[in-house]
């Protein structure tokens, strides 16, 4: 579940700057309590201008996308990101986070969902049911590959994703 609240106590290895801050937290149980314990790695600051109610309505999909693209991948404006299963919950959240970051967005999705993703501003959409996307990404990026892969696939699709990743690129899942 999700919770919004003010940090009132910290564990031993937690950044002290979080104390007193309002955060959105992903927690497994107990979000309807007056106090909860949350992993600091699964907390993000409540954005300026966002109410607690708005923050609490964000889904785990958005927290996953924010944490993955901002905290882990450190996505920068102008970088290219490949979002697998971009029509799904985490994929849609990642698409919005990446767009807000100013990244160039490539995606995979099933054929019936590809047109909708193009309307959302995705530059290229590839078939998620074929590993041909790796070669297509390399062609589109003129052999460079993407800076970030947001992965939700398995098996040979993971290997293909690594082939589509630029030198020094980041793979998150």
Model feature map: region roles:
Residues 59-130:
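Mid-domain Rossmann-like dinucleotide-binding core that forms the NAD(H)/NADP(H) cofactor-binding site
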Residues 145-152, 172:
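Periplasmic-binding protein-like
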Residues 165-166:
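Helix-to-beta-strand junctions that scaffold the AdoMet/dcAdoMet cofactor pocket
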Residues 2-29, 47-49:
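A glycine-/small-residue-rich N-terminal strand-loop-strand element
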Residues 18, 49-51, 74-80, 143-144:
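Short helix-loop-beta connector
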Residues 132-144:
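Short amphipathic alpha-helix with an adjacent loop that forms part of the alpha/beta core around
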Residues 169:
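Glycine-centered, small-residue-biased loops immediately flanking beta-strands
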């Amino acid at each position: 579940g999700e919770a919004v609240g003010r940090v009132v106590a910290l564990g031993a290895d937690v950044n002290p700057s979080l104390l007193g801050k309002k955060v959105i937290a992903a927690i497994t149980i107990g979000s309807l309590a007056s106090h909860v314990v949350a992993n600091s790695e699964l907390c993000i600051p409540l954005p300026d201008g966002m109410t607690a109610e708005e923050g609490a309505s964000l889904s785990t999909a958005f927290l996953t996308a924010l944490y993955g693209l901002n905290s882990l991948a450190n996505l920068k404006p102008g970088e290219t990101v490949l979002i697998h299963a971009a029509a799904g919950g985490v994929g849609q959240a990642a698409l919005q986070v990446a767009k807000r970051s100013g990244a160039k967005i490539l995606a995979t999705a099933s054929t019936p969902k590809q047109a909708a993703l193009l309307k959302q501003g995705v530059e290229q959409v590839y078939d998620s049911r074929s590993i041909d996307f790796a070669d297509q990404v390399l062609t589109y990026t003129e052999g460079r590959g993407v800076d970030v892969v947001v992965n939700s696939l398995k098996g040979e699709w993971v290997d293909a994703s690594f082939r589509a990743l630029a030198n020094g690129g980041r793979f998150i899942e």
